[in-house]
From Swiss-Prot:
Protein name: Copper transport protein CutJ
Organism of this sequence: Bacillus subtilis (strain 168)
Residues annotated to bind Cu cation: H24, H110
Family: In the N-terminal section; belongs to the CopC family. In the C-terminal section; belongs to the CopD family.
Signal sequence interval, chain numbering: 1-25
Lineage start: Bacteria, Bacillati, Bacillota, Bacilli, Bacillales
Induction: Highly induced under copper-limiting conditions. Down-regulated by CutR/YcnK, especially under high copper concentrations. Down-regulated by CsoR.
Topology relative to the membrane: Multi-pass membrane protein
Annotated localization: Cell membrane
Record's keyword annotation contains 4Fe-4S: no
Length: 541
């Protein structure tokens, strides 16, 4: 028994120990470009996305003005760069207006599609603008996730209720516990079962008939990351369902020995779920997945714990002596407080990765849903704080009504989370040139500009001026050392020398900034009187 207890304590420690959508895929650039007028026929259409796209359900179909296909019907994703999708065109295409219809499944498992119009020769008519399909809410996905999140919270809340918070014995409580556990397992299985056809329908872009076509289901399962993760989730669910049978049959709800294996499978399910959301494709992928895992775990424990207090203690609150109910709430309070802290920490960190501007927060459906969820979270937090304060002074009156209110808000939070995780997260703000000035000794200053400040070729320009703003002319040499920072940063540094454009102004083009993220640029200069300039700039793109 002691050995099993240590195993469960170690498991919980690993869950709560912080370790080290952004959006659906969108086009970074394409060739031909949107609304471009080409002088001659291109050999192929190439589309580059901001993130890798899946092997399944991808295509580029190119049509002329008569609606005839003019591509070779063989769309490929580059083996050395899964961001790029190409299709070759038929030879010697005549002057005409064309449209390239594309479809792909982004790394976070969401299908995206659109149209790129272009012409060979002058376009007589107007172009239709590029559109991105499936950017609205998918009701099926949202409903499925609402069922999933509710089932997860009910299960873990009920299990932890008996393992850690409740110390009484009641035959009626045993019956209610069995019903809740059985119902939550059934709901969890239903959510996972529905997830496959819902995802297949979204990937195929058709009606519900396509959701059950064997070919499409096979493509979802074996040619998308979401399908592989679904197989893992299904296996973990079967193991979870089988492992809880002994505990339910023997009514061993407070035995660590009976619940060690089910909890391992349960938290494995949560971890697998974290691999399918927006957090799985943020730049700091490891951090995003772990924060999503901690966020979902903590929310499940908090909301599920409140649900257990409402559903399992309903009769205890009606008793003249409410000591047992109050003691249970008192034991739950530090768990709730810890869960709230983890929710805040993980939510803010992942929000930083996904919401890159205030405009995205207030003027996109994703940001607005996140604000609604945050508002509900605050209401729930206020009620939780009231309950925490009440536990410090045990009262004769119960708190069943306010617990029900907190649980109702918690369910609303889970539903809102299901909605906004089904929405496309905001695209990155358009890159802006970097410009920063820093002071050095003797009243001089160093100004660095980087344009266009995005992965690829950038123009680096550096100016050294005196206290009057005039160029310092005795600079002999300027070198820049560029390297990426952060958890995914590389120790490899790129050093290059800027060429003197005019006195005090040094410039050069360079490909050192080859991906998005946080970068440091170390400036080293040497003056004519052998003094050194050493200063560091930090930028994000």
């Amino acid at each position: 028994m002691k050995r099993n207890r240590w195993w469960i304590i170690l498991l919980l420690f690993l869950v709560f120990l912080p370790k080290t959508s952004f959006a659906h895929a969108y086009i970074v650039k394409s060739s031909p470009g949107e609304n471009s007028e080409l002088k001659s026929a291109p050999a192929q259409v190439e589309i580059e996305f901001n993130e890798p796209v899946e092997e399944g359900f991808h295509y580029i179909k190119v049509y002329n003005s008569n609606g005839d296909r003019v591509d070779t019907d063989k769309t490929e994703i580059k083996k050395d760069n899964h961001h790029i999708m190409t299709v070759k065109l038929k030879k010697n295409l005549p002057k005409d207006v064309y449209r390239a219809e594309w479809n792909a499944v982004s790394a976070d498992g969401h299908p995206v599609s659109g149209v790129i119009p272009f012409s060979i020769g002058k376009a007589d008519g107007g172009f239709s603008s590029q559109k991105a399909a499936d950017s609205a809410l998918n009701p099926g996905t949202a409903a499925d996730r609402a069922i999933l999140y509710t089932a997860l919270s009910l299960f873990i809340g009920t299990v932890f209720f008996h393992l850690f918070w409740y110390k009484g014995k009641s035959e009626q409580l045993v019956k209610r516990t069995r019903r809740i556990l059985t119902g939550s397992i059934a709901a969890l299985g239903l959510a996972l079962l529905l997830q496959l056809p819902i995802q297949t329908k979204a990937n195929a872009g058709g009606g519900w008939g396509s959701a059950f076509q064997p070919g499409y289901i096979r493509e979802t399962l074996f040619e998308t990351a979401g399908g592989s993760i679904w197989i893992i989730q299904a296996a973990l669910f079967v193991l979870l369902a089988l492992s809880v049978i002994p505990a339910i049959r023997k009514n061993r709800f407070s035995s660590f020995g009976y619940w060690t294996a089910p909890l391992i499978f349960f938290f494995g399910l949560l971890l697998a779920k974290a691999f399918t959301g927006h957090a799985a494709v943020v730049e700091e992928k490891t951090v995003g997945i772990l924060m999503d895992f901690l966020h979902l775990t903590s929310a499940s424990i908090w909301v599920g714990g409140i649900a257990a207090l409402v559903l399992l203690l309903s009769k205890e609150w009606r008793q003249p002596d409410k000591t047992l109910a109050w003691e249970t709430v008192r034991r739950f309070s530090p768990w709730a407080l810890t869960a709230v802290g983890v929710i805040l920490f993980s939510g803010l960190l992942n929000g930083f990765f996904i919401i890159r501007s205030m405009d995205s927060l207030f003027h996109t459906a994703y940001g607005q849903a996140l604000l609604v969820k945050s508002g509900l979270f605050v209401f729930m937090l206020v009620l939780g704080a009231i309950h925490f304060l009440l536990t410090r002074k045990q009262r004769r009156t119960g708190i069943s009504r306010t617990l029900k209110a907190e649980w109702a808000i918690g369910i609303a939070v889970l539903i809102t989370a299901a909605v906004f995780t089904s929405l496309p997260s905001p695209p990155e703000p358009a890159p802006e040139p970097f410009y920063q000035t820093k002071a050095i000794e003797n009243g001089q200053s160093v100004s660095l500009s980087i344009s266009p400040n995005q992965p690829g070729k950038n123009v680096f320009e550096l100016r050294v001026t005196d206290h009057n703003g005039d160029p310092v002319k005795n600079i002999q040499q300027i070198t820049l050392t560029v390297y990426k920072t952060g958890l995914s940063g590389s120790e490899n540094k790129s050093t290059f020398t800027l060429k003197e454009k005019t006195k005090g102004v040094f410039q050069d083009q360079n490909l050192s900034i080859n991906e998005k993220g946080n970068w440091k640029i170390k400036v080293h200069g040497l003056t004519g009187d052998f003094n050194e300039i050493n200063i560091m700039f930090t930028k994000t793109n």
